[in-house]
């Protein structure tokens, strides 16, 4: 059985790590480099660097910061925000990214997923899917959650898999930053219907939530920010807790 992964996420804006609630009300969460160094030594399996305002402001990801982080960490680094072309993906890889995360640009041009996958391999392409519950449906949103799309979450998940995505980063906008637990309903629905790994995101508030994301949501990895950035828990604590409950993790 493949080990489940714990992935801290650096949401970056104006050169700092930030964290909000429901994609709003951003709070400073420290220095990018200090947080990256901390997680590199903390048993994190991977690290995600998301320039959360790049797509909203129609600009490139802050690649200078990406390069600095890549020189400090020796775990897989996923970079997202403003990856709107194969050229920008290439730039991210040249600055130390191991994977790129696409979201807004993939909705506008779904073929972008295929183009990046063909050039760099599916394993290097993560498609971030931000979902919000509207009535009984989970609707995909873009531009840092500001704009609803025509896609329902399950439909889009299947489409990106066919286009060559190697992984899905599924974020519940309703749960983001609330510390109320992952939305394991949509998480399970998508995780059990696609054949690529799904990363749970949005809502982790304690170690039991991580466990539930794996046990109930069938996630392959759990992404979290608030509980780790503000040192509520260490990743070592999280992995020990999970292992004691039968979840296979690397320690």
Curated annotation (Swiss-Prot):
It catalyses: 5-[(5-phospho-1-deoxy-D-ribulos-1-ylimino)methylamino]-1-(5-phospho-beta-D-ribosyl)imidazole-4-carboxamide + L-glutamine = D-erythro-1-(imidazol-4-yl)glycerol 3-phosphate + 5-amino-1-(5-phospho-beta-D-ribosyl)imidazole-4-carboxamide + L-glutamate + H(+). The keyword Lyase applies. One of its GO terms (molecular function) is imidazoleglycerol-phosphate synthase activity. Its EC number is 4.3.2.10. The active site is at 11, 130. The keyword Amino-acid biosynthesis applies. It is found in: Cytoplasm. It comes from the Bacteria. CDD domains: HisF. GO terms for cellular component: cytoplasm. GO terms for biological process: L-histidine biosynthetic process. IGPS catalyzes the conversion of PRFAR and glutamine to IGP, AICAR and glutamate. The HisF subunit catalyzes the cyclization activity that produces IGP and AICAR from PRFAR using the ammonia provided by the HisH subunit. NCBIfam families: hisF. Heterodimer of HisH and HisF. Belongs to the HisA/HisF family. This is Imidazole glycerol phosphate synthase subunit HisF.
